Amino acid sequence: MTADDRIKLEPSWKEALRAEFDQPYMTELRTFLQQERAAGKEIYPPGPMIFNALNSTPLDKVKVVILGQDPYHGPGQAHGLCFSVQPGVPAPPSLVNIYKELKRDLNIDIPNHGYLQSWADQGVLMLNTTMTVERANANAHKDKGWQFFTDRIIEVVSQKQPHLVFMLWGAHAQSKQKLIDATKHLVLTSVHPSPLSAYRGFLGCGHFSRTNKFLEQNGEAPIEWRLPPVV
């Protein structure tokens, strides 16, 4: 895997991450993915969608970072944005709880889909720290190398951008706090929106209104969290 034209990567990210594609971990990760596919294993998201978070939100446009763990592992769900699913796929339980908090926090009606592309288009970097998964096998690609790549993404965006909001939901996301310059960015933490934990503090966290208040205080347009209908 090299940072050349064989990888469709948005130019600002390609430049910022160029050195990562020459690292030994990336060679090992590429080999692992090739071997998994050769063994007939189905990998999500589909290849062209793996870098969707970066391609949807150029480095200099990032305002908010939401961290996820690894992609959804059901057919047709993952498309490269954490917590989001492709059009026509029901919203998974964690996303339903995100919608419940949006309703409570900003009185935004719960949409009938789970496609969060409009957030990414407005500057919300929706990054899974592991960017691929095997079908029906959660965390199958954990510790295969993606963590080095996505740690570097977090470091780069923290360094390059002046005033970001990081939403860190759950212990895994919060373990990345050490990569973030909290002297200039707003770091919001909560339990994960999973049904197993959301009632312990995610529901009621107010992260969406707090994000927009911080953005406006720093001269940035707020995020329109209300999702457009999917046609």
Swiss-Prot record:
SUPFAM superfamilies: Uracil-DNA glycosylase-like (SSF52141). It catalyses: Hydrolyzes single-stranded DNA or mismatched double-stranded DNA and polynucleotides, releasing free uracil. Keywords: Cytoplasm, DNA damage, DNA repair, Hydrolase. One of its GO terms (molecular function) is uracil DNA N-glycosylase activity. Pfam families: UDG. The keyword DNA repair applies. The active site is at D70 (proton acceptor). The keyword DNA repair applies. GO terms for biological process: base-excision repair, AP site formation via deaminated base removal. Its main location: cytoplasm. Its EC number is 3.2.2.27. It is found in: Cytoplasm. One of its GO terms (cellular component) is cytoplasm. SMART domains: UDG, UreE_C. It is an enzyme of class 3 (hydrolase). InterPro entries: UDG_fam1, Ura-DNA_Glyclase_AS, Uracil-DNA_glycosylase-like, Uracil-DNA_glycosylase-like_sf. Belongs to the uracil-DNA glycosylase (UDG) superfamily. UNG family. Excises uracil residues from the DNA which can arise as a result of misincorporation of dUMP residues by DNA polymerase or due to deamination of cytosine. This is Uracil-DNA glycosylase. It comes from Pseudomonas fluorescens (strain Pf0-1). The gene is ung.
